[in-house]
Amino acid sequence: MKVILTMAISANGMIATKDGSEDFLSHDNWERFVNLANRIGCFIWGRKTYDAVSKWEGDFLDDVKGLKKVVISHSPAKLVEGFISANSPEDALKKLEANGFNQAIITGGAAINSEFAKRDLIDEVIFDVNPSILGEGIPVFSPTDFLTNLELVSSEKIAGDIVELRYKVTR
């Protein structure tokens, strides 16, 4: 299965402020995620990302209503309708494959991103780099021992001053 990591980040690689706020990110990032997710048909989140998005004001989860959505959690979480639970990256991918998917998006948080990278499960990386720098924050990857080499596929200025960087993982 092809696994695509896609994240909206600050210029210095943060996905959220120290307290979890994503207010520095443009709404264009969400729209781009929704468009990609609709093309692929599914995505994987960690429990903390699921919890954070569930608390956003508005009906953001309606944007992904028809998609297969997996939340990875070591402690079973109460999920809203349309989400399924998995206990590991491999379990999440197995559940999506069983539903006929051959591609999946992962989009955080840091711990889940690191677990996929550590297991060498990521095939492509898309970073939407926002024009902000955070002194403190939550990085794309939590501190874990792994090395993933990348080859730049494309770079493009998209909405506003956001730059999309696309990489393929080299093995």
Predicted features and spans:
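Enzymes that bind and transform nitrogen-containing heteroaromatic metabolites
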Residues: 1-171
